[in-house]
Each structure stands twice: as structure tokens, then as C-alpha cells.
Amino acid sequence: MKAEQQYIDLFTHYEDLICRHAAGLMNLPRAEALADLERLGFPTVKSEDYKYTDVAQAFAPDYGVNINRLDIPVNPYDVFRCDVPNLSTSLYFVVNDTFYDKMLPKAHLPEGVYAGGMRTFMEKYPEVASRYYGKAAPTGKDGIVALNTMLAQDGFVVYVPEGVVVERPIQLVNIFRSDVDTMANRRILVIMEPRSEAKLLVCDHSIDDVKFLATQVVEIFAGEGAFFDYYDLEESSMSTTRFASVHVKQEAGSNVLVNGITLNNGLTRNNYYIELNGEQAEATLCGMSILDKEQQLDTYSHITHAVPYCTSNELFKNVLDDHAVGAFSGRILVKEDAQKTAAYQTNRNLCATREARMYSKPQLEIYADDVKCSHGMTTGQLDETALFYMQSRGIPRDEARMLLSVASVSYTHLRAHETEL
């Protein structure tokens, strides 16, 4: 039996129950998502874009799915402590894949701004929700997105009206909590109306030793002149598998930063899709990982320049120790009408041991003739000369290796005012 079949059977048998416990508008695309999953199936290692991640193996185990929305006995405010010092945020929680609404933060948000659960948002702003939900993440191209759309019952929404600036970052913490192996299907929807500004930090944490499988679909809409920063920090566990897709649509003059950081995980696949659909739009896509033991991170990106005078900057850095495995496949597509495009892609990797492995495939696909584009990749090992010099100055070898590793992934181009994030 194919790995996706158990999830198709689950939905077929319990569709009424899934829909009954879900936010209303989330039920509309389920039938199409089911048909797409049946047609596409899961990606296989025969696919060039998934050759380093065995999706079927990851989804094959029998995970529990909380379709009844049973209450999880945990107070996230008691079990979570942020590792980032002096970080002032508006803090929200999702437990597995359910928005935690029993205790909400005191209102630090400007009037008209919404941050909270999908169900309440769809009841409060039904027209806005129907205009955006599912519109950036089509189910007809990726079986995992189709699976998520078919099964997701709740989510988190950030909505910022036109011209509103949210000074304090919004922080969403995804907590895994269960006594049995569990699957979570999460959605995040971000709607930035013209000339609005906000920042969202999403953190993943596991507090139990059982196996977790997460699918996550993030949709970001940036209106004309909007500024939005999205930070994704994964600090889960070696028993956690995550498949995440970030889909961004930008209008004229908008500026979006997407920053993914992986520090602790088991197997992670991150997909990034960015569309620059309005002139003078700017996208910054960057990522950093420090992996060891048997950790695995597979990153795929696709940036589309559809119109003239847009800029994209892409930088991913990885440090791999022990038997860690990393992969990066990035594509920049410059369409024929996208003259005066500036697009840059860089991948830098450090393998700290002979057993660590990194696979990289940067790509440019250009159909316009008046552009400035570049792409490049380097993969190397620790500088033994520098390591010897540091040891000769009294720094223990393990500390010297760590210092050199951290230095190799330091960021020099992030926005200076975001020092805490």
C-alpha cells in the first residue's frame, strides 16, 4: 500500500468528523485536495526535487491524528521558556495543531490587527478569509500540500489592515505534546494589506520523546508597499519529522524577509515559493542550520520574477557535523517581461567531519535580457590552520571547532534593527 493511502482512507471514513471540528471555510477545498492527493501521491526519490528525502518512509508509520479536537492536558505558558534573551513579543501558542485560546496575551496590537486562531478569524472576517485562504498554496502541484489542506482543521492568522504598523513582533510557538506518536497538520495565514508592517516569529518545540510528524503550510500575502518579516526557528527533537511549505505573493513595492533557522530536528524538508508580482518588490530569503548526529535538512526554493524592476536576495548557510546530511536546491525564474531584475543566490556549507554530507544545486532560469543575476555554491571543511592556531593560543579543540563553525554561518546582511531576532 502506498504511504498516502492510509491518509486518503482516514479522510474518506471520517470526513464528516473532520469537517465538523474545523473552521468552516477550511472545508471548502478539501474535496479538491483529496482528488489532487489521489492523482499526485507523495513525491518520490525519483523526483529530482526530492531525491534526498524519502517522503513515503516518513509518512508510512501509523501516527495518531486528533480529528476529534480532544483537549491536550498542557499549559504552554508553564512548559515553554524562550531561549532568546530580552525578546519582547506578543506570544501565542499552537499545541500540536490546535490554537491555544484558553489564555491569550494582553492586547499589545494596534486597533484592527488580528492575531489568533483560524476559526475566530473566519467568523469575524469571512470575506477576507475566503479571498486569501488556500490561494497561495495550490494543492495541484504538491501531494504534501494537498494532504495538509485535506486534513488541517485549525490554524493561526495574522491580519494587518492598510497603513497599520505593528511595532512589537508577534511570536507563535508550536508545541508538540503527546503520549503517543502523533501527526499535526498546521496552517498559517498572513495577510498584509497595503503599506502595513509586521514581524512574525514562529518557533517549534517538542516536550515529549515520542515521534512527531508535522505538515505545515504558510501563506503570506504582501500588498503594495507592505513590509513583513517571517522568522522560522526549529528547535524540536531528533524524533520529529517536519514538512513545511512557505508560499509568498508580493505586490508592487512590498518588502518581505523569510528567514529559516534549524538548530534541533530529526528530518526537515523546507519548501519556499516566492512570487514577485508587482514592480519594485523586494524579497530576501535566507536560512541557517547547525546540524549534528543524524540530523537531516532538505531545502528547496523557487523564486519567480514575473514583472520588471524587482530584487531578490537568497542566502543559505549550513554547518554539518557527525553524520548529518543537508541538501539545497534553489531555482530563480526570471520571466520574459521581468526586465531590470536583480536576483542573487548563494549557498555556503561547512562539513565539519568526513562523514557529513551536503548536496547543493543552485539554478537560474532567465528569459529576460536586461538583468543582473548570479548564483554560487561552496562546500568546504574546517580550516585546520585556523584550528591549530586557536589551540596554540589555549582554546580547547572542541571549543575552537564550535567557534569556527558558528563564524561560518554568521549573518552580515540581515536588517540591523532586528538584533534580537
Task: List each model region and its residues.
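Single conserved hydrophobic/aromatic residue that forms the stacking wall/gate
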Residues: H413-L421
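Hydrophobic/aromatic-rich, well-ordered segments within soluble, folded domains that form packed cores
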Residues: N27-P43, L151, Q381-L403
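Conserved beta-strand/loop scaffold segments within soluble protein domains that form the structured core
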Residues: K106, E111-Y114, K124-F388, S392-I395, ...
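N-terminal amphipathic, basic helical "cap/leader" segment at the start of enzyme domains
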Residues: M1-A146, L315
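Short, surface-exposed loop/turn segments at secondary-structure boundaries that line and modulate
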Residues: F42-T44, M377, S405-Y411
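Short amphipathic alpha-helical segments with coiled-coil-like heptad repeat character
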Residues: G41-D49, V166-E167, T311, D398
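Catalytic-core signal marking the mid-to-C-terminal active-site face
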Residues: A22, R401-V406, L414-R415
